[in-house]
Amino acid sequence: MEAFITFARYNRQMNAQIYDVCGQLDQGQLEADRGVFFGSIYRTLNHIMIADGYWLQRVTRQPSPLADSAGEPLAIRSVDQILYQELATLSHWRSIIDDRIVGCMEALAQESADLSRLLDHRLMDGSVVQFTLHKALCHWFNHQTHHRGQVTTILSQLHIDFGVTDLLLMELN
């Protein structure tokens, strides 16, 4: 579980870094189609948030913490849905979700979670498949890194220095 705690902390730090850098971009730069899976930086950041809400819900067996401005739970209808229209709001919820993910990994370690426990995963076609907790956690952190890598590539193409992304150097920064 120590590895998953490390990944959760790394993701929290990288997400904070990416939102800080993206906060310097104008709306046009955030929303321009860049040819990645979800088109733009903004849509990619929303997609990562949706996936994290889903996985947090599955692993903790608790409702997703994502909510609207009135505090009502957000209904997630698709993996490319725009959850929040403003980057500041998305960033606020990103911080909350990242803290919850770190807390979730720490709780799993504390309770010596059974990594062979099966989780149900509903596919977009409605069918249900099962994965072990271990495989689900590996997928979850790989998914974040994969899509965040798309965003850092776009930033690099815009000649914006994102900074160090090496996990080994995380604690030095």
Which positions does each model-derived feature cover?
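Short, contiguous alpha-helical
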Residues: 5-20, 29-77, 122-173
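Absolute protein N-terminus
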Residues: 1-2
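Helix-adjacent hinge/juxtasegments
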Residues: 65-111
